[in-house]
């Protein structure tokens, strides 16, 4: 349960999912929403992330940040996407742990489900078939 006076950090607040989270939080009356764009915080920089979290002391983190692109870009730059996204995830999750954040919600990608998955996708379909390359 997120209390009305909780400090909430939304990593990836400029993306599709992050914007929706911010919109919903504001609609529900949350006032202490923390966000930082790439110019203010490089999520691939472990030290910067830890400093940011220790300074801001969020009660909750929504991890919706990721390097994204289309299927063509994902295929062409596979290692780059994997490296940057793993760095973001590791830095935010470890930074949350080291700075004492008690609640973190990590949002994954639909690409971990089979590319021809029956709709609507069920959680049990996770990694049960061929994925997008």
Segments from the language model and where they lie:
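N-terminal Rossmann NAD(P)H-binding glycine-rich loop of SDR-like oxidoreductase domains
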Residues: 2-28
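Residues at the starts of beta-strands that form the adenosine-phosphate
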Residues: 7, 31-32, 102-103
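NAD(P)H-binding glycine-rich loop region in Rossmannoid oxidoreductase-like domains
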Residues: 46-86, 98
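Adenosine-cofactor binding site in Rossmann-like domains, unifying the SAM/SAH pocket
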Residues: 26-52
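SDR active-site strand-loop-helix element
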Residues: 11, 36, 61-67, 104-109
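Catalytic helix-loop patch of NAD(P)-dependent Rossmann-fold dehydrogenases
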Residues: 76-94, 98, 102-103, 111-133
């Amino acid at each position: 349960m997120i209390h009305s006076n909780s400090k909430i950090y939304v990593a990836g607040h400029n993306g599709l999912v992050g914007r929706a989270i911010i919109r919903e939080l504001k609609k529900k009356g949350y006032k202490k929403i923390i966000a930082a764009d790439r110019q203010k915080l490089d999520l691939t920089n472990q030290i910067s992330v830890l400093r940011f979290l220790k300074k801001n002391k969020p009660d909750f983190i929504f991890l919706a940040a990721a390097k994204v692109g289309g299927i063509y870009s994902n295929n062409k730059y596979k290692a780059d996407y994997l490296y940057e996204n793993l760095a973001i995830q590791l830095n935010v999750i470890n930074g949350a742990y080291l700075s004492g954040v008690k609640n973190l919600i990590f949002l994954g990608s639909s690409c971990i489900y089979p590319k021809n998955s029956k709709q609507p996708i069920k959680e049990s379909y996770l990694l049960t078939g061929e994925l997008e390359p």
